[in-house]
């Protein structure tokens, strides 16, 4: 256990504050060491029995504050369950540290139980792979373990030229794996001197210039940067919008305040009415929003396009139409010479909200567009919201409008999987406090083990789960799929009582029968201050038709922008 304690304490000195622990024997030294550090208030320890769910829980916790969260698992198949969360951490640039126990080299390739080639399981999704000594980390000097911790921390945080992401530390342990209480008390009195973690140096060259005196447009995609950089990013964008007068097409995930100037509300319904010359400039921030219409619109555009990312140098332009620069918005605007301080009049906007309110009244049967329109208004201002990476994130982009800016919206669109949806939300709520999750039924069922975190934690996360139950994969209803086997091949409806499943985990729930009951149900759910489920049933076929009808009708509303 001494080596495990040395390693974990070195990570704590770098800044590790939270660790999610999964059960196992080979990982016993790490578990015991984590318990010692937790007893000394050096580490917050969370336990979880499902490694896949645990990794997503940790990823949600890391995303909430932009800090590394560690996961500890035993050896064997347990390690393979970390891959989905590692992939999402890679693509969404979130720091995650995966500590896996392993057998020593003497037990490798000889048929020993629970011994697999786990070193290679996560390689493709990780920023860095590190390994303890093959004979067991007990053979390593403290300096070597300290250096391993510092290197892992740097890589997870995005040191050098790479963005934050997942790091895999594979740690062989030789028996004996477990220590006596007396030995633990002796080890707990030891302490390591702090070792500094050097700051990364960006080393980024000059970026393409854009002319604020000429026409242009800003497309703000999902925010994918460090939490500490967000305020500077917002201020830089605010300045550019005032200087240029360019319209802003903002994704709900862009982490922008509602008073951001020049914002076009419900822009996805009005792209064809934007009054811009063919050679207008385009400033794109971060990844693409989840809009095929925007993609087609940008591909038709003939003017220069600049894509700015927040420290991620990897290619992020699936349209292949933009010059990419990874220095961040704040650094880019600082490079633009001779910017005038005068503020241009903001662009004309066509607010479709009054029209949408007549089309989507807060009464009658539940529909997905109506929920996307009303929930941002009815949920308390500044309550964070997580949107499942399926229909909810797309519906809020299209129908949510101005009120989306009242909430910091999250959605794990790095790899856009629905796996881990509930566990991710639990992790966010554990660190952010009260949070609402908007999800479909398949995404929730796919990660139903996430409900385990409702009862395993000492203080259950205050999470309000808004389940849009439309009997299967509603996202497929919006695609041009023509097959007689649509229900069984694509929609895949499941015969599961979601309220009963939640209740089996001690989670209270209610059914919302109509939109008139929504406001009272939200108030009840938020008052619980713990995980709670609201089930809202809709008809996905009817909702798909409603979306088409509203899109067509919106073309006749208002004038050219």
Swiss-Prot record:
UniProt KW keywords: Magnesium, Manganese, Metal-binding, Thiamine pyrophosphate, Transferase
Keyword Transferase among record annotations: yes
GO terms (BP aspect): menaquinone biosynthetic process; phylloquinone biosynthetic process
Note accompanying the cofactor annotation: Binds 1 thiamine pyrophosphate per subunit.
GO molecular function: 2-succinyl-5-enolpyruvyl-6-hydroxy-3-cyclohexene-1-carboxylic-acid synthase activity; magnesium ion binding; manganese ion binding; thiamine pyrophosphate binding
Cofactor: Mg(2+); Mn(2+); thiamine diphosphate
Pathway: Quinol/quinone metabolism; 1,4-dihydroxy-2-naphthoate biosynthesis; 1,4-dihydroxy-2-naphthoate from chorismate: step 2/7; Cofactor biosynthesis; phylloquinone biosynthesis
Catalytic function, reaction form: isochorismate + 2-oxoglutarate + H(+) = 5-enolpyruvoyl-6-hydroxy-2-succinyl-cyclohex-3-ene-1-carboxylate + CO2
Enzymatic class: transferase
Matches recorded under InterPro entries: MenaQ_synth_MenD, MenD_middle, THDP-binding, Thiamin_PyroP_enz_TPP-bd_dom, TPP_enzyme_TPP-bd
EC numbers, comma separated: 2.2.1.9
Role according to the record: Catalyzes the thiamine diphosphate-dependent decarboxylation of 2-oxoglutarate and the subsequent addition of the resulting succinic semialdehyde-thiamine pyrophosphate anion to isochorismate to yield 2-succinyl-5-enolpyruvyl-6-hydroxy-3-cyclohexene-1-carboxylate (SEPHCHC).
Subunit structure: Homodimer.
Record-stated family: Belongs to the TPP enzyme family. MenD subfamily.
NCBIfam families per UniProt: menD
Protein name listed in UniProt: 2-succinyl-5-enolpyruvyl-6-hydroxy-3-cyclohexene-1-carboxylate synthase
Organism, scientific name: Synechococcus sp. (strain CC9605)
Gene designation: menD
């Amino acid at each position: 256990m001494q080596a495990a304690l040395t390693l974990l304490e070195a990570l704590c000195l770098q800044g590790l504050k939270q660790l999610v622990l999964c059960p196992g024997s080979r990982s016993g030294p790490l578990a015991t060491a984590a318990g010692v550090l937790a007893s000394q208030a050096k580490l917050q320890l969370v336990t979880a029995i499902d490694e896949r769910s645990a990794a997503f829980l940790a990823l949600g916790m890391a995303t909430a504050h932009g800090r590394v969260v560690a996961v500890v698992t035993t050896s064997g198949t347990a390690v393979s369950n970390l891959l989905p969360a590692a992939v999402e951490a890679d693509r969404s640039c979130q720091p995650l540290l995966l500590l896996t126990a392993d057998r020593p080299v003497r037990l490798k390739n000889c048929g020993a139980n629970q011994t697999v080639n786990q070193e290679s399981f996560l390689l493709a999704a990780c920023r860095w792979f590190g390994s303890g000594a093959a004979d067991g980390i007990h053979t390593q000097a403290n300096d070597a373990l300290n250096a391993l911790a510092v290197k892992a921390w740097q890589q997870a945080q995005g040191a050098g030229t790479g963005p934050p992401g997942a790091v895999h530390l594979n740690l062989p342990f030789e028996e004996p794996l477990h220590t006596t209480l007396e030995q633990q008390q002796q080890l707990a009195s030891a302490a390591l001197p702090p070792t500094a973690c050097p700051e990364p140096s960006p080393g980024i060259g000059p970026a393409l210039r854009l002319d604020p005196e000429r026409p242009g447009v800003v497309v703000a995609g999902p925010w994918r940067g460090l939490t500490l950089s967000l305020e500077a990013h917002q201020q830089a964008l605010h300045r550019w919008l005032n200087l240029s007068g360019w319209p802003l097409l903002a994704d709900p995930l862009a982490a922008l305040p509602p008073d951001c100037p020049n914002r076009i509300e419900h822009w996805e319904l009005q792209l064809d009415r934007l009054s811009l010359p063919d050679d207008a400039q385009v400033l794109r921030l971060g990844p693409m929003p989840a809009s095929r219409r925007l993609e087609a619109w940008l591909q038709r555009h003939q003017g220069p396009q600049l894509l700015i990312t927040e420290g991620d140098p990897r290619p992020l332009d699936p349209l292949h139409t933009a010059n990419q620069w990874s220095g961040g918005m704040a650094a880019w605007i600082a490079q633009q010479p001779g910017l005038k301080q005068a503020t241009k009049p903001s662009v004309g906007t066509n607010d479709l909200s009054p029209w949408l309110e007549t089309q989507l009244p807060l009464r009658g049967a539940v529909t997905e567009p109506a929920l996307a329109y009303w929930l941002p208004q009815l949920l308390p201002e500044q309550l964070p919201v997580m949107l499942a990476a399926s229909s909810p994130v797309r519906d809020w982009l299209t129908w949510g409008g101005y009120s989306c800016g009242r909430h910091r919206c999250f959605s794990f669109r790095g790899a856009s999987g629905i796996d881990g949806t509930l566990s991710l939300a639990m992790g966010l709520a554990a660190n952010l406090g009260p949070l609402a999750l908007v999800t479909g039924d398949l995404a929730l069922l796919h990660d139903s083990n996430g409900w385990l975190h409702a009862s395993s934690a000492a203080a259950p996360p205050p999470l309000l789960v808004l389940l849009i139950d439309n009997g299967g994969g509603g996202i497929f209803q919006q695609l041009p799929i023509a097959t007689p086997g649509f229900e069984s091949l694509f929609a895949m409806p499941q015969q599961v009582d979601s309220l009963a499943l939640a209740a089996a985990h001690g989670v209270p729930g209610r059914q919302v029968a109509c939109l008139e009951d929504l406001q009272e149900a939200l108030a009840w759910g938020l008052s619980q201050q713990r995980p709670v489920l609201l089930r809202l049933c809709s008809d996905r076929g009817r909702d798909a038709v409603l979306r088409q009808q509203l899109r067509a009708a919106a073309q006749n509303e208002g004038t050219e922008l």
